[in-house]
Regions:
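Active-site acidic carboxylates
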Residues: 1-141, 169-170, 189-201
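Gly/Ser/Thr-rich loops at beta-strand to alpha-helix junctions
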Residues: 58-61, 179-185
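Small-residue (G/S/T/A) turn/hinge positions that recur once per unit in extracellular repeat modules
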Residues: 146-148
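A short, acidic, amphipathic alpha-helical segment used as a generic capping/interface helix at domain edges
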Residues: 156-170
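Catalytic cores of soluble, metal-dependent hydrolases
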Residues: 165-166, 181-187, 194, 207
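A short glycine-rich beta-strand->turn/loop micro-motif centered on a GG-aromatic cluster
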Residues: 175-182, 197-207
Length: 207
């Protein structure tokens, strides 16, 4: 069995931004790995001069875990305090693009729509007027099949642009961990695609 240090060296995490999505106690029952193994890996990665970011569903957005309690949970799972001291924490919330995801709209089509909204400073798809929709449909007529337009026009639900987009925009050389792969992790992936930020996913620590 390969050691964590060997995995870190083999995968080449040096200088990467490791963005961990919703690896927190509320979701531990659905994970396919042990939180302490993930924390031990982060300790090794941090030693390779990587930046560590924790995106989580917390007290400010969803009334869930506080940042202090989250940090204590990480320490209980063997995360080094030196890693904690330099890590970045962001209470992100969720369900920005879930209506499209849950209705099986193509990820690239959702990302294109999110990019259009972001670049045109439209935070809520319900604020899209006829002119904005026409502009979007023209811009992506060769790639999208009006899936987003058809879905949102027929429902009262929406896509909204979270502050998370501005946060993610700062980072490069991104490696993702966490989950859920068809839920919050996918929302982060779509946000990165919309921002045209290349990323990879480390499947050993996804759920």
């Amino acid at each position: 069995m390969k050691s964590l240090k060997h995995i870190v060296n083999e995968q080449g995490f040096s200088g990467k931004t490791i963005i961990n999505v919703d690896i927190q106690p509320e979701y531990a029952g659905g994970m396919f790995f042990k939180p302490y193994e993930w924390c031990e890996w982060l300790n090794e990665v941090d030693g390779e001069s990587s930046r560590i970011v924790f995106l989580y569903n917390g007290a400010d957005t969803l009334g869930m875990i506080s940042e202090d309690d989250y940090k204590n949970w990480l320490i209980e799972n063997a995360l080094d305090e030196s890693v904690l001291d330099t890590a970045i924490f962001y209470d992100k919330g969720y369900a920005f693009f879930r209506y499209c995801i849950d209705n099986y709209i193509d990820d690239d089509a959702v990302a294109n729509f999110v990019r259009f909204m972001y670049e045109n400073d439209i935070r809520d798809s319900r604020d899209m007027d006829r002119e904005a929709w026409a502009k979007y449909l023209r811009q992506y007529r060769r790639t999208d099949k009006k899936e987003v337009y058809t879905l949102l026009q027929a429902s009262g639900d929406c896509v909204h642009i979270p502050d998370l987009m501005d946060f993610l925009k700062r980072y490069n050389n991104i490696v993702l961990t966490g989950g859920g792969v068809n839920e919050c992790l996918k929302e982060v992936e779509i946000a990165l695609k919309a921002l045209k930020k290349p990323y990879s996913t480390f499947s050993k620590f996804t759920y």
